[in-house]
A protein has these predicted regions:
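Conserved N-terminal structural module of periplasmic/extracytoplasmic solute-binding proteins
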Residues: 4, 26-101, 410, 422-425
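C-terminal capping/gating helix-and-loop segments adjacent to ligand/active sites or protein-protein/ligand interfaces
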Residues: 51-52, 70-71, 133, 309, ...
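Extracytoplasmic "Venus flytrap"/periplasmic binding protein-like
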Residues: 62-126, 155-166, 267, 274-275, ...
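Extracytoplasmic/periplasmic substrate-recognition and gating elements
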Residues: 68, 287-350
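Hinge/lid segment of periplasmic solute-binding proteins
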Residues: 97-148, 163, 172, 198-199, ...
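Extracytoplasmic/periplasmic solute-binding protein
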Residues: 139, 172-228
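Glycine-centered hinge/linker elements that transmit conformational signals in sensory
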Residues: 218-257
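Catalytic centers of hydrolytic enzymes
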Residues: 427-621
Length: 621
């Protein structure tokens, strides 16, 4: 064979190899490409409380089986989302309960403008105005309302032949009549900031919703303004006059400042107080106990009636969704279901009526709320101003009014001065540094990297062979960033995450892992792949079929787990789930239940804390 022929053969062979390589590459997805595809197909929803994870989230997923939704329990704190925004980790959909446009201002440019959407158009203008920025844009939409007003023992009124209040004057008369028979007419749990804040605003809801009131509120909440905004001199002086009058008429004293929720509930249950300020949920609770209870609104001194409301939470969407039409469409579908009547009915407490700010949700009031039907139909549901400043300053100033330290004029000046004062710098001591960001999207081949980091780190903190955690244990916020104490603490789910440690055999561990993966009676049942548990110290294989999950294998140190192995196991779960998950009493208890957040905080305070590396802990087939 001559050289020319040999070269031709070699060239043809090389071309064949290259061609096969190209074809093979087109037919096989790399692991990285698969993960990118999973990321693109996933819509992440951060929930403000774990309560929503158990009923609300599964319903939303059930209505959108073709959308992969990953629900993560975040924090009820806008500072948490500001931190995620600053470090490239803002989720697709955010929910927050403790909320104000004032505190949300730094997030505005990162959020979608929902003003022209059908979802925003369905909200009554009266309420939508509370969410409009000064430029007319709308970034946040409210779900249904938690109604606060006066919980009233009607049986006591009938027993002492005292007329039920119909206006402010008759409310005061009722308080005076009860005092004559040795019963408090009214009190509330004024040890809490929100009770102080809501009483102050509720008594002046009529004035705060006037044109002047809305003008001030818009200026106070304007995200474009960097100047601190105090109280106006048109609406607010009168608000403190009404608060002072209310304190005088109800005979509130410094002793009331020590009352907490349990104290007030006990007084009401024992017939020691006729009325208290609280949630409408109390009506059903006391009726179930045989106490004839009704709900009443605030009686404004101008004759109007108002209910104080706070949305159970507000929803916002990440503006980055607008860069991908398919992802935006999926997110809007999720938003639509989140705001639906059926979904919102899963938010409210047992026995509460669904009070929606949306015209798409019909008004159906039960016996518990029939006395305020006219108030609701008039759209007199006042949405509180709930900035961090208003919580803190209301607690300070209203408490001093109740204690007799401030007159109305002094209270107004003190409140205004505190709003205008420069903020005290936050404690920015760095307690943890993460050198890289980890994905918090669940991947079929490996699980969630950020959750794995937290599970592996906590396995070291607890000094345990194996750690099992429900998926809602972590907030997924492993970012390339420096963490101060507050943000580091927020890496753990905030709502009562407990730990329990035991020594188990391999056989007992298998059954425990099975309960975490497949669900168990009385416990949490995973409803999508993102809700599957997180494990450390072992790796698991899980089969997915028709929305249910089956444990098919466990390995430890690369080898199948043996039934006669002995291991220490630490389980993390919400308090109400722990008993069901460990109902078999598998193994021997080594440690009592502890709060994970406290253990994590103690670990960070010791200095030198570091995050572990992620591992592939789950294979989903």
């Amino acid at each position: 064979m001559n050289k020319r022929t040999l070269r031709r053969l070699l060239s043809a062979f090389a071309a064949l190899v290259i061609g096969l390589s190209v074809l093979t590459g087109c037919g096989t997805k790399t692991a990285e490409n698969v993960e990118k595809q999973e990321d693109a197909q996933t819509i992440q929803v951060y929930l403000w409380t774990n309560n929503l994870y158990e009923t609300y989230a599964p319903y939303i997923q059930s209505q959108l089986p073709d959308v992969n939704i990953e629900f993560i329990v975040g924090n009820n704190d806008l500072d948490f989302y500001k931190f995620l925004q600053e470090n490239g980790g803002l989720p697709d959909i955010i929910t927050s309960c403790r909320f104000s446009l004032h505190d949300a201002a730094p997030l505005k440019d990162s959020l979608m403008n929902l003003a022209l959407t059908n979802e925003a158009g369905a909200v009554y203008n009266t309420y939508l105005n509370s969410f409009k920025n000064e430029d007319g844009s709308v970034n946040w939409l409210p779900v249904c309302a938690d109604a606060h007003g006066f919980v009233v023992n009607r049986g006591l009124f009938e027993q002492y032949d005292i007329p039920l209040p119909t206006d402010y004057e008759s409310f005061v008369s009722a308080c005076q009549a009860f005092e004559k028979v040795g019963i408090r007419g009214f009190t509330a749990d004024y040890t809490y900031d929100y009770t102080c804040m809501e009483t102050l605003q509720g008594l002046s809801a009529a004035e705060l919703t006037t044109t002047d009131g809305r003008k001030w509120r818009t200026a106070y909440s304007d995200p474009a303004s960097t100047a601190r905004v105090g109280l106006d001199d048109t609406v607010w002086p009168g608000a403190f006059e009404r608060m002072a009058q209310f304190i005088q008429d109800t005979h509130l004293t410094a002793d009331d400042l020590a009352l907490n929720y349990d104290d007030v509930i006990g007084m009401f249950r024992n017939g020691e107080v006729a009325m208290y300020f609280g949630s409408s949920a109390g009506v059903k609770m006391f009726r179930d106990e045989g106490i004839d209870t009704i709900f009443m609104p605030f009686f404004s001194q101008n004759g109007e009636k108002w209910i104080m409301t706070t949305p159970y939470f507000q929803i916002a969407l990440n503006r980055d969704l607008e860069q991908d039409t398919a992802r935006r469409e999926k997110a809007m579908k999720v938003l639509n279901v989140m705001l639906s009547e059926e979904a919102q009915s899963r938010i409210i407490s047992d026995g509460q009526d669904l009070l929606s700010y949306s015209q798409n949700v019909p008004l159906r009031l039960t016996e518990c709320m029939k006395d305020v039907r006219d108030v609701v139909e008039e759209n007199h549901m006042y949405i509180r101003i709930a900035s961090n400043d208003f919580f803190a300053v209301s607690k300070d100033v209203v408490s001093k009014m109740i204690a007799g330290e401030y007159t109305a004029q002094q209270a107004y000046r003190a409140f205004n001065a505190q709003l205008l004062a420069e903020e005290t710098p936050a404690d920015d001591e760095i307690v943890l540094t993460s050198g890289k960001s980890c994905s918090n999207v669940f991947h079929a081949n490996g699980g969630s990297a950020s959750f794995s980091v937290m599970a592996n780190t906590l396995r070291g903190v607890y000094g345990t062979d194996v750690l099992l955690a429900t998926a809602n244990s972590f907030t997924g916020s492993v970012l390339q960033a420096d963490y101060n104490k507050k943000m580091a603490a927020s890496m753990i789910m905030p709502n009562g995450l407990m730990s329990r440690q035991r020594t188990m055999t391999g056989a007992e561990l298998k059954e425990t892992v099975r309960a975490f993966v497949e669900g168990c009676e009385g416990g949490f049942v995973p409803f999508n792949r993102g809700s599957l548990p997180v494990v450390s110290g072992i790796a698991v294989e899980v089969k997915e079929a028709g929305g249910s999950y089956t444990l098919t294998g466990i390995t430890r140190n690369g080898q199948p787990l043996r039934d006669d192995d002995t291991v220490t196991v630490t389980c993390l779960a919400a308090e109400n789930q722990m008993e069901a998950l460990l109902a078999s009493e598998s193994g021997r208890s080594l440690d009592g239940d502890t709060w994970v957040k406290n253990r994590w905080r103690d670990h960070l305070s010791g200095g030198g804390a570091a995050l572990a590396e992620p591992e592939n802990y789950m294979t989903l087939r």
